[in-house]
């Protein structure tokens, strides 16, 4: 191979359309399951083949516990807030829309729970029940309330509370991000989304510029234990989901 020409396409639907039209020689990263039916239906016409490979990875969302915004940082480190944001997510809807009902909603356990006998059912299912009323009560307990009557919740200091999720489709399907952003907005945490390149996402994450971290994670316990980057802040290499960038500076 003398030359590889790679073009970034900023919208997943446009990327899929180009693959259907046979304009792509090879594509692996950033091709997510929701595109599967369209790609399979048009494989003969587009003169390409589709290989669906199994994976142990799962879409992981985390709040930046060392975000530069100190008011948000205090909220993100409140366990009531984090539980609320988890209970607000409609995982069954995500499973049906993004995974065609083939997935199993689970809590993230840092490694593939099926490779570790000590991971309990309670840990696998911690805070994953879709309960927006319960989520609102937890937000109240975290003092994240609507203080000005506009219908949106504010930070405890009275400042406007807005979240922006920057994501790359290499790490998560756009449909998953869209559903979660709407779920969070429904409980009063107005959330917007922006698709960026993988390089842009990684640079912003490592510069501690993101409120929410989003990536695909999953590896066997043996691999996890052999990778020291997973055990100390920021808990991943540059190419993974990182959290606690300021903790890394402290250490």
Task: Give each language-model segment a name.
Residues 1-100, 104-105, 114-151, 155-251:
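Extracytoplasmic/periplasmic ligand-capture domains
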Residues 109-110:
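Outer-membrane beta-barrel and related beta-rich outer-membrane complex signature
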């Amino acid at each position: 191979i003398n030359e590889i020409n790679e073009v970034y396409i900023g919208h997943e639907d446009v990327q899929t359309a180009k693959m259907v039209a046979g304009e792509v020689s090879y594509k692996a990263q950033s091709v997510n399951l929701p595109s599967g039916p369209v790609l399979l239906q048009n494989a003969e016409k587009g003169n390409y083949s589709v290989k669906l490979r199994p994976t142990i990875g799962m879409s992981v969302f985390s709040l930046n516990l060392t975000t530069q915004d100190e008011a948000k940082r205090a909220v993100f480190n409140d366990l009531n807030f984090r539980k609320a944001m988890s209970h607000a997510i409609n995982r069954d809807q995500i499973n049906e829309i993004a995974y065609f009902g083939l997935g199993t909603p689970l809590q993230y356990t840092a490694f593939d729970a099926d490779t570790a006998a000590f991971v309990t059912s309670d840990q696998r299912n911690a805070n994953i029940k879709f309960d927006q009323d319960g989520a609102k009560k937890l937000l109240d307990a975290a003092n994240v309330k609507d203080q000005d009557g506009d219908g949106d919740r504010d930070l405890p200091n009275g400042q406007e509370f807005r979240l922006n999720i920057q994501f790359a489709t290499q790490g998560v399907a756009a449909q998953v991000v869209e559903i979660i952003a709407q779920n969070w907005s429904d409980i009063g945490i107005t959330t917007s989304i922006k698709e960026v390149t993988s390089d842009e996402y990684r640079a912003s994450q490592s510069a501690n510029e993101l409120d929410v971290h989003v990536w695909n994670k999953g590896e066997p316990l043996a691999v996890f234990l052999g990778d020291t980057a997973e055990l100390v802040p920021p808990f991943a290499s540059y190419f993974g989901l990182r959290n606690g960038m300021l903790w890394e500076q402290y250490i």
